[in-house]
From Swiss-Prot:
Record protein name field: Small ribosomal subunit protein uS19
Native source organism of the sequence: Trichodesmium erythraeum (strain IMS101)
Signal sequence segment: none
A GO molecular-function annotation: rRNA binding
Entry keyword set: Ribonucleoprotein, Ribosomal protein, RNA-binding, rRNA-binding
Transmembrane segments: none
GN (gene name): rpsS
Family: Belongs to the universal ribosomal protein uS19 family.
Keyword Protein biosynthesis found: no
């Protein structure tokens, strides 16, 4: 279920302040964040945000197509190592 339109998108306050400060200075800098649930807004386009995946910060470059999605969608938390191999075929 989507969020109510009257509430607006969720974005962490500390992240919004950092984005606005960088936009005011016209700088590009990597921003570290643990806020995977923050929605990507148009002000973030062109910035690189390092999103925490539980182990490390994954750098995510924000493009136009990402607006409206959550930051956590672009930093996978699980590593897939493949299914177990068939031991009979190795003999």
């Amino acid at each position: 279920m989507s969020r109510s339109l009257k509430k607006g998108p969720f974005i962490a306050d500390h992240l919004l302040k950092k984005i606005e400060a960088l936009n005011a200075k016209n700088e590009k800098q990597v921003i570290k964040t643990w806020s995977r649930s923050s929605t990507i807004i148009p002000d973030m386009v062109g910035h690189t945000i390092a999103v925490h995946n539980g182990r490390q910060h994954v750098p995510v470059f924000i493009s136009d197509q990402m607006v409206g999605h959550k930051l956590g969608e672009f930093a996978p938390t699980r590593t897939y190592r493949g299914h177990g191999s068939d031991k009979k075929s190795k003999r």
